[in-house]
């Protein structure tokens, strides 16, 4: 398929999750409706990951595409109908007999994802070492956490040009090259093993020198065959604490098998969240999630959340923006050369600020223009003028004077306060 056709096929999937309730805003949101270029809901401004959208197949397609043309093709299967690669995530179902007074019932626990290891006891141990609120048990807080991290850590628009907004043919080509590069140089999937299993593979394969693993015997004493000296002490690459004997560890091939992590320590070095499904990116001796690895390589537009492949973009408020996306967060009007106000790290044009966000003057009860000086105390504000910032009793101007605040009113003296009480 040529680049022109690829550009024509691009779309943000606006029908996906339409009407889904917002888990954060509850009834305040009318239901999910994707903004035409931002990756947020038009109704409540929350991201798709904050809505109760059924995305299992879509997420499996996304991760399947990520693993396509990599050494991790064993984790994907291509659909016969359209050849789309699908992620074969490992689902683990545990059954535990529960004793009752008269009979024995079976308690079934389903993990929406588990490490793809043959030893189920090892997978169970891995899960138990994660914080309970992050264990992906179906229908639990942990499953919701995994779903949210899949969306946050591995944005589809960081790997698929068709999920981006109006890329030029040149930008599509540059993005494809970028994705190909990170797949070959940074992408990896963690491997759960017992540290003693790795010993059996020998030091040559494990790259022992220079690692965070220490052997108790010096080189001159290596001929001592006693079990005490042969035992190896392991420490976590992240927290530096010792690994307990018999506990599973995570290895990252790109980091070298001399490094290992506690299951709960296998996190992104930027956001410090668990690396979802143990999918990592390795750079400069650090683990990253997909999002923060890409952020370390390319600027990201604060408007559309996409990586910027254009040579021209703007920087404002310590953030990067596509030229066409430096817009008012409320009405989408272009802000280049216009007055704007930052509200919760989002730029808002002056008319929208006055209409939707401006504080109201306690004196005249009108909105305070963002360019006008004001006086604020606790949650109350006044125009800094002789007409508004006055004693609530005698109307004396209080600019530059001491005052006594009482529930939205201000007084010049105790006497005035008493007269109004």
Curated annotation (Swiss-Prot):
Domain of life: Eukaryota
Name the UniProt record assigns to this protein: Testin
Organism: Papio anubis (Olive baboon)
GO biological process, one term: negative regulation of cell population proliferation
Compositional bias (Basic and acidic residues): 155-164
The keyword Lipoprotein is assigned to this record: no
UniProt remark on domains: The N-terminal and the C-terminal halves of the protein can associate with each other, thereby hindering interactions with ZYX.
Function: Scaffold protein that may play a role in cell adhesion, cell spreading and in the reorganization of the actin cytoskeleton. Plays a role in the regulation of cell proliferation. May act as a tumor suppressor.
Annotated GO CC locations: cytoplasm; cytosol; focal adhesion; plasma membrane; protein-containing complex
Name of the gene this protein is made from: TES
Record-level Gene Ontology MF annotations: zinc ion binding
Domain LIM zinc-binding: 234-297, 299-359, 362-421
Keywords of the record: Cell junction, Cytoplasm, LIM domain, Metal-binding, Repeat, Zinc
Record-linked InterPro entries: LIM1_Testin, LIM2_Testin, LIM3_Testin, PET_domain, PET_testin, Pk/Esn/Tes, Znf_LIM
Region entry Disordered, spans: 133-164
Self-association and partners: Interacts via LIM domain 1 with ZYX. Interacts (via LIM domain 3) with ENAH and VASP. Interacts with ALKBH4, talin, actin, alpha-actinin, GRIP1 and PXN. Interacts (via LIM domain 2) with ACTL7A (via N-terminus). Heterodimer with ACTL7A; the heterodimer interacts with ENAH to form a heterotrimer.
Subcellular location: Cytoplasm; Cell junction, Focal adhesion
Keyword Iron-sulfur assigned: no
Family designation: Belongs to the prickle / espinas / testin family.
Residues of the PET domain: 92-199
């Amino acid at each position: 398929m040529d680049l022109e056709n690829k550009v024509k096929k691009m779309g943000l999937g606006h029908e996906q999750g339409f009407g889904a309730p917002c888990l954060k805003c509850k009834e305040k949101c009318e239901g999910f409706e994707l903004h035409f270029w931002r990756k947020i809901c038009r109704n409540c401004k929350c991201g798709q990951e904050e809505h109760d959208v059924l995305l299992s197949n879509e997420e499996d397609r996304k991760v399947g595409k990520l693993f396509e043309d990599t050494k991790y093709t064993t984790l994907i299967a291509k659909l016969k109908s359209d050849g789309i690669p699908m992620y074969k995530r490992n689902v683990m179902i545990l059954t535990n007999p529960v004793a009752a007074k008269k009979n024995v019932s079976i308690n079934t626990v389903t993990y929406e994802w588990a490490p793809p290891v043959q030893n189920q006891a090892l997978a169970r141990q891995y899960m138990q070492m994660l914080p309970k609120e992050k264990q992906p048990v179906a229908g639990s807080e942990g499953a919701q956490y995994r779903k949210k991290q899949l969306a946050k850590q591995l944005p589809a628009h960081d790997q698929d040009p068709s999920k981006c907004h109006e890329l030029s043919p040149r930008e599509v080509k540059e993005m494809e090259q970028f994705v190909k590069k990170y797949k070959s140089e940074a992408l990896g999937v963690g491997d759960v093993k017992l540290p003693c299993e790795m010993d059996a593979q020998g030091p040559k394969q494990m790259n022992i020198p220079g690692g965070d693993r220490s052997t108790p015997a010096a080189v001159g004493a290596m001929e001592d065959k006693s079990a005490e000296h042969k035992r190896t002490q392991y420490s976590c690459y992240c927290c530096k604490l010792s690994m307990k004997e018999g506990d599973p560890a995570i290895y990252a091939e790109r980091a070298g098998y001399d490094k290992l992590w506690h299951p709960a320590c296998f996190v992104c070095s930027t956001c410090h969240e668990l690396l979802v499904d143990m999918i990592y990116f390795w750079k400069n001796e650090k683990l990253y999630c997909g999002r923060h690895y890409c952020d370390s390589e390319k600027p990201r537009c604060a408007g559309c959340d996409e990586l910027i492949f254009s040579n021209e973009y703007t920087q404002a408020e310590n953030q990067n923006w596509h030229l066409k996306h430096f817009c008012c967060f409320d009405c989408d009007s272009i802000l280049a050369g216009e007055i704007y106000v930052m509200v919760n790290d989002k730029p808002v044009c002056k008319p929208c600020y006055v209409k939707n966000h401006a504080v109201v003057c306690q004196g005249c009860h009108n909105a305070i223009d963002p360019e006008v000086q004001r006086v604020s105390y606790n949650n109350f504000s006044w125009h800094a003028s002789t007409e508004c910032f006055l004693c609530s009793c005698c109307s004396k101007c209080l600019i530059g004077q001491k005052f006594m605040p009482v529930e939205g009113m201000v007084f010049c003296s105790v006497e005035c306060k008493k007269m109004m009480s």
